[in-house]
From Swiss-Prot:
Major location (coarse): nucleus
GO cellular component: microtubule; nucleus; phragmoplast; spindle; spindle pole
Native species: Arabidopsis thaliana (Mouse-ear cress)
Subunit comment: Forms a dimer. Binds to microtubules (MT). Bundles polymerized MT via the formation of 25-nm crossbridges following an intracellular dotted lines pattern and at the minus-end of phragmoplast MT near the nuclear surface.
Gene transcribed to yield this protein: MAP65-8
Record's compositionally biased regions (Basic and acidic residues): 553-562
Protein name, as recorded: 65-kDa microtubule-associated protein 8
Single annotated GO MF: microtubule binding
Length: 562
């Protein structure tokens, strides 16, 4: 008990100034009054002391827990502050003391303002990141051709571990680059749209429909942001290229039509009123594609009007060329007929088709005709002397035929109205007939010389002249032999002498008379003569046959081009 008494007294003395000490004294008074045993008192006091110890232990444990929590909070605050410094790229917190001191609560109180400041900075930095990344996503969506609504549904992710100014500056640089790219694309779109409008105005097409067909956002009437994606830029560029090609194509067509109009005007001697309607087409001849930009200058209506005018003038030209060609053909035929040459055959329908199709130009056609006329005239000039002698021979042959018929007339010496006139003609005819042999020989010499010089046969109405003359000489010799035979027969049958001059043209057998009387103007040979049977075409075959001129003109034009 003594060992316990001291602690009790010590504890009692320590509790005198406390409520516990007061209660202990009150308990002792009660015990004294009751007469409680010391042992029991000691036991109760031990129980009280044990309970006090446990109460203190609980308080100490609670205090330890609180202290640990404060340590943890302080560590977490320090860690959070350090994290803020790292993610924000800050080296220190302004206003926070470098040395750490004081109680835990004081330390927490000292770090709390820095944490609040860093949280505010982080929140502000996150807002900046969200704003910049949102703009980046928006512009990227515009460049990619996605709608802003579709892109706004995407969540903006922020990396909390890197919110430094350096990272923010990188995003801002990216945003600045995207802004520049967007502006550049918008400028390209505006340039393309402006080019489409200018080209459409020049071509006379509706620019609004073309632009809307590419994408509705490009039309200002829709009031939405313009699509600036690569696909749209590609379509715009393709549209501009297509319009430029159409412009070049139309301009080339108008150049062709303008040259055709100019040539036709000069050829047809068109009036000023007819030309004035298409002066704008002629003005384009000296214009390059880059110079043609006036609205409505190369519309389809202008091209169609020019085509219609060219077609009209071509038809008029074809009609006049046909008239001119027929005139030249008549000149060629007259030249050939006068010189008894074969007329080159032509086919007017084929000629017209060749001119219309463009295979033969009217200039080449007329030049070919002029060349044929020139050749015909040159050949006619070379044949002139021979033809004149042939004509004289033909006339002499007619006289010879008439004289034969006259000599066979038994009543030629009878007194009649025309007897004296016929007698005088017979005298002249005998003189003419006597010169036929020399004339024929002269023609043969000249014709053979002409054939040697020209290296071709001399044709008279499509019949070889030399052969015709040789046949004539042969028949003339036969006729002389027949005359000689008849003379001998008469001498044998009639003893009286008869003057040869009076009996030269006595009656002849019917076969001889028929053969001689059937001789025609064409060299004095009838249809039954060998020369006419051989050359059945005759001497006067001057029909207008156009079967081969188209081919010959094409051949000659190709030769001249070669």
């Amino acid at each position: 008990m003594g060992s316990l008494q001291t602690p009790i007294e010590m504890r009692s003395s320590s509790l005198l100034d406390t409520s516990c000490g007061y209660l202990l004294r009150e308990l002792q008074m009660i015990w004294d009054e009751v007469g409680e045993d010391k042992f029991e008192r000691e036991k109760v006091l031990l129980d009280i002391e044990q309970e006090c110890v446990e109460a203190y232990r609980r308080k100490v444990d609670h205090a330890n827990v609180s202290r640990s929590r404060l340590h943890q909070e302080l560590a977490e605050s320090e860690a959070e502050l350090t994290h803020f410094l790292l993610c924000l790229g800050e080296r220190s917190v302004p206003g926070r003391p470098e040395k750490k001191g004081g109680t835990l609560r004081e330390q927490l109180d000292s770090i709390a303002p820095a944490l609040r400041e860093m949280r505010l900075r982080k929140d502000e930095r996150v807002k900046q990141f969200r704003s910049v990344k949102g703009e980046i996503q928006k512009i990227s969506a515009e460049i990619a051709g996605r709608s802003t609504y579709e892109d706004s549904t995407r969540k903006i992710t922020i990396d909390d571990n890197d919110l430094s100014n350096k990272k923010l500056e990188e995003y801002q640089n990216e945003l600045h680059r995207l802004h520049d790219e967007k502006n550049e694309r918008l400028q390209k779109v505006d340039i393309y749209i402006c080019a489409i409008r200018d080209l459409s105005a020049t071509l006379g097409t509706e620019a609004s429909m073309i632009i809307t067909k590419i994408h509705p956002s490009l039309n200002d009437l829709y009031g939405i942001s313009k699509n600036i994606s690569d696909d749209i830029l590609k379509k715009l560029n393709g549209t501009v290229v297509s319009l430029e090609e159409e412009k070049h194509k139309r301009l080339e067509k108008l150049h062709h039509l303008g040259r055709a109009l100019s040539n036709l005007w000069n050829l047809m001697d068109a009036s000023y009123e007819d030309r004035q309607k298409f002066f704008h087409v002629i003005d384009l001849l000296s214009s390059a594609p880059s110079d043609v930009c006036a609205p409505g200058s190369i519309t389809l209506d202008i091209i169609q009007q020019a085509e219609a005018e060219v077609k009209r003038l071509d038809q008029l030209k074809a009609s006049r060329i046909k008239e001119l060609f027929i005139k030249k053909q008549k000149e060629l035929e007259d030249t050939c007929n006068m010189s008894h040459m074969e007329t080159p055959s032509t086919e007017m329908g084929n000629i017209t088709n060749l001119v219309d199709s463009g295979e033969v130009d009217h200039v080449d056609l007329l030049a070919a005709m002029d060349e044929k006329i020139a050749r015909a005239k040159e050949e006619a000039a070379s044949r002139k002397g021979i033809i004149e002698k042939v004509d004289r021979w033909m006339l002499a042959s007619d006289e010879e035929r008439w004289l034969e018929e006259y000599d066979q007339d038994e009543n030629r010496y009878s007194v009649s109205r025309n007897a004296h006139r016929n007698l005088r003609r017979a005298e002249r005819a005998r003189i003419t007939v006597s010169k036929i042999s020399g004339l024929v020989e002269s023609i043969l010499v000249k014709a053979k010389s002409w054939e040697v010089e020209r290296q071709k046969v001399f044709l008279y109405n499509e019949v070889p002249l030399v052969a015709m003359l040789q046949e004539y000489n042969k028949l003339r010799q036969e006729k002389e032999m027949e005359k000689q035979r008849l003379r001998e027969m008469k001498k044998m049958s009639i003893p009286q002498p008869v003057a040869e001059g009076d009996n030269f043209y006595m009656a002849r057998p019917a076969s001889s008379n028929r053969r001689i009387s059937n001789r025609s103007m064409n060299g004095g040979f009838g249809s039954g003569s060998p020369i006419n049977r051989k050359y059945s075409g005759g001497f006067n075959n001057t029909n207008n046959n156009y079967t081969a001129l188209g081919t010959s003109i094409r051949r000659e034009s190709r030769k001249s081009e070669a």
